[in-house]
C-alpha cells in the first residue's frame, strides 16, 4: 500500500474526539518529571444518528476499546482512574482498576494494554502520563495526536491498519508491538521489527511517524524526524518561511491595484516605419524660417570649408569646397547633387 494520507485535521486542539465520541482525549499540562498528561474517556456506545461506517465499526470486533498490546522500551506509564472501571493486562495478568486504587504504574519493558472494562456502566475516564526519557522518540503529545488520528482514519476510511504505517507511528512513540508469546525473545523481536520495518524500511518507502494534520507542535515533530537518517528526507522546511495572515495582508497593500486579468496579455513588438516630414529649403533656409547656412559661407552647403560640396562634403572636387568659386547655383540643382552624394572630399572622387 502507498503511504497514508490523513482524512481530517485535528492539530491545535487540546480536546480531540474520535469515532464519533467513542474516544475523547483532553491534553493537560504534565507535572514535573512526566512528558505528557491527558484525560481520556472511552464509551461503550454512541447515542444518536451516526454514519453507517461508524455503526459498522462499533458493532465489529475491532471497535476501539483500548490500544493493542504493546510495551515501552524506555518509559514507565502511569494510570489513574477518575470514573468507571478500567481493565489492564500486564504481562498476561488482567487487573480491574477503579478510582479507589489510586495511581498504578506499568514499568518499562512490560507488555500491557488497557481497556474499558465490561463492568463500566457507560464510560471509563482515566488520566494517563509517563516518565520523561529525554529521547527523540518517546510517549508524548505528538505521538498520541498521531496515533489516535491515524487509528480513527484507518478504521473508518481505510478498512483497517496498514502494518508498515502502524509500526512507523508506534516506533515514533516508544511503543512497540511484541511478537507472539510463543516466540523466544518476543520483546527484542518486536522492538527490532518496529525499528527495521517501521523506521528504516518504512522511512525509505515514504512512511512518516508524524503528520502535520494531526500534530500541534509541528516544529518539534520535524526535529524528531530530522534525527533519523531514514526519515529526514520526508521533512520539508518551507513551512517555517510562510508568513502569517497579517503579514500577507501587509504585502497585499503594497502590490499593484490592478488584477492580473486586466493586464495586457501581449505587447505589440512588430516594427513600424519611421515617418518623417519632407524637408523643404528656400535659398538655404528651412520653410519654418530656421536659418541654416548660406550656399557659399563657411560651413555652408556649397562652397565653404567643410560644406557639403567642399572638404567632407558630397559633391565637388575642390579641397576646401569650391564648387565654382563665386557662382550661385540653383537650389534645386544643389539638392540633387547633395542627394546623389558625388565627388566631394570623403565623397567618391574628392580628397579623403
Swiss-Prot record:
Gene3D superfamilies, alphabetized: Jelly Rolls
GO MF: oxidoreductase activity
Keyword annotations: Oxidoreductase
Highest taxon of the lineage: Eukaryota
Pathway: Secondary metabolite biosynthesis
EC number: 1.-.-.-
Its job: Oxidoreductase; part of the gene cluster that mediates the biosynthesis of aculins. The pathway begins with the synthesis of 6-methylsalicylic acid by the polyketide synthase (PKS) acuA via condensation of acetate and malonate units. The 6-methylsalicylic acid decarboxylase acuB then catalyzes the decarboxylation of 6-methylsalicylic acid to yield m-cresol (also known as 3-methylphenol). These first reactions occur in the cytosol.
Family: Belongs to the oxidoreductase OpS7 family.
Record's protein name: Oxidoreductase acuE
Organism: Aspergillus aculeatus (strain ATCC 16872 / CBS 172.66 / WB 5094)
Amino acid at each position: 500500500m502507498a503511504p497514508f494520507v490523513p482524512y481530517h485535521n485535528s492539530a491545535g486542539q487540546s480536546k480531540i474526539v474520535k469515532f464519533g465520541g467513542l474516544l475523547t482525549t483532553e491534553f493537560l499540562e504534565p507535572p514535573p518529571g512526566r512528558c505528557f498528561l491527558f484525560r481520556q474517556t472511552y464509551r461503550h456506545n454512541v447515542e444518536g444518528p451516526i454514519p453507517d461506517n461508524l455503526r459498522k465499526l462499533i458493532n465489529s470486533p475491532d471497535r476501539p476499546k483500548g490500544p493493542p498490546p504493546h510495551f515501552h522500551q524506555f518509559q514507565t506509564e502511569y494510570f489513574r482512574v477518575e470514573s468507571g472501571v478500567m481493565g489492564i493486562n500486564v504481562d498476561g495478568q488482567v487487573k480491574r482498576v477503579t478510582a479507589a486504587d489510586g495511581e498504578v504504574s506499568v514499568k518499562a519493558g512490560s507488555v500491557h494494554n488497557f481497556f474499558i472494562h465490561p463492568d463500566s456502566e457507560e464510560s471509563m475516564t482515566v488520566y494517563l502520563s509517563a516518565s520523561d526519557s529525554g529521547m527523540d522518540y518517546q510517549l508524548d503529545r505528538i505521538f498520541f495526536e498521531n496515533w489516535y488520528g491515524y487509528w480513527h482514519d484507518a478504521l473508518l476510511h481505510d478498512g483497517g491498519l496498514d502494518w508498515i504505517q502502524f509500526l512507523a507511528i508506534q516506533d515514533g512513540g516508544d511503543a512497540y508491538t511484541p511478537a507472539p508469546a510463543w516466540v523466544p525473545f518476543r520483546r527484542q523481536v518486536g522492538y527490532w521489527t518496529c525499528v527495521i520495518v517501521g523506521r528504516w524500511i518504512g522511512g525509505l518507502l515514504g512512511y512518516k511517524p508524524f503528520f502535520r494534520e494531526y500534530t500541534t507542535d509541528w516544529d518539534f515533530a520535524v526535529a524528531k524526524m530530522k534525527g533519523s537518517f531514514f526519515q529526514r528526507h520526508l521533512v520539508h522546511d518551507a513551512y517555517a518561511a510562510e508568513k502569517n495572515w497579517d503579514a500577507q495582508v501587509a504585502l497585499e497593500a503594497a502590490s499593484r491595484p490592478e488584477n492580473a486579468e486586466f493586464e495586457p496579455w501581449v505587447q505589440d513588438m512588430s516594427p513600424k516605419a519611421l515617418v518623417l516630414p519632407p524637408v523643404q529649403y528656400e535659398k538655404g533656409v528651412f520653410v519654418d524660417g530656421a536659418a541654416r547656412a548660406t550656399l557659399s559661407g563657411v560651413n555652408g552647403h556649397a562652397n565653404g570649408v567643410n560644406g557639403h560640396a567642399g572638404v567632407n562634403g558630397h559633391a565637388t572636387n575642390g579641397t576646401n569646397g569650391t564648387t565654382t568659386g563665386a557662382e550661385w547655383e540653383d537650389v534645386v540643382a544643389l539638392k540633387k547633387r547633395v542627394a546623389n552624394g558625388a565627388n566631394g572630399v570623403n565623397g567618391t572622387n574628392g580628397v579623403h
